[in-house]
């Protein structure tokens, strides 16, 4: 089946899901749910956690936070994101409540590589249960470019159920844009597990019913 045919099938389901349900007072996200089969959740190979860079950035961007020092800290502040330095991390180590708040509000935590040990020890216990993890950044990386890329990125992960759920955009995006984002998620799953591991695919709005994507295998 050609990629264009797959896109058309996904787009058809998304278009239907966007029309279902009453309008809400808030902008709803659009999600993809991928049900998997023949997956051993006890196997390390099945416990995937991958980054997907969506080709079409949602208007509701993922919140990016940066842990850095020196020039990278300054560049991140210029980019307008929340920034923590070494001293900020050390202060947080005494305040688990604030660490949990940070873990809730930051979808991505980009960490300068030489601060990964400290960030992992302090932030890891709060990020892990939320399916998140600090992302190491080389000291010479262009942090502004990375921030922009991660604003359009989502985690793809398998935890305690044989399925993947990911936000692919918002209801004000076009069905084709959302379909292209959904395809990016599917390609990452297939690259890791193989297409034969995908059982069913659904799309839905936050408060809407799931709509199954026609078979694309």
Swiss-Prot record:
GO molecular function: rRNA binding; structural constituent of ribosome; tRNA binding
Annotated signal sequence range: none
Keywords per UniProt: Repressor, Ribonucleoprotein, Ribosomal protein, RNA-binding, rRNA-binding, Translation regulation, tRNA-binding
GO cellular component: large ribosomal subunit
Pfam families on file: Ribosomal_L1
Iron-sulfur found in the keyword field: no
Coiled-coil segments on the chain, per record: none
Gene Ontology biological-process annotations: regulation of translation; translation
Family to which this protein belongs: Belongs to the universal ribosomal protein uL1 family.
Subunit structure: Part of the 50S ribosomal subunit.
NCBIfam families: PRK04203.1 (NF003244)
Function noted in UniProt: Binds directly to 23S rRNA. Probably involved in E site tRNA release.
HAMAP family listed in its UniProt record: Ribosomal_uL1_A (MF_01318_A)
Full protein name: Large ribosomal subunit protein uL1
Organism: Aeropyrum pernix (strain ATCC 700893 / DSM 11879 / JCM 9820 / NBRC 100138 / K1)
Species classification: Archaea, Thermoproteota, Thermoprotei, Desulfurococcales, Desulfurococcaceae
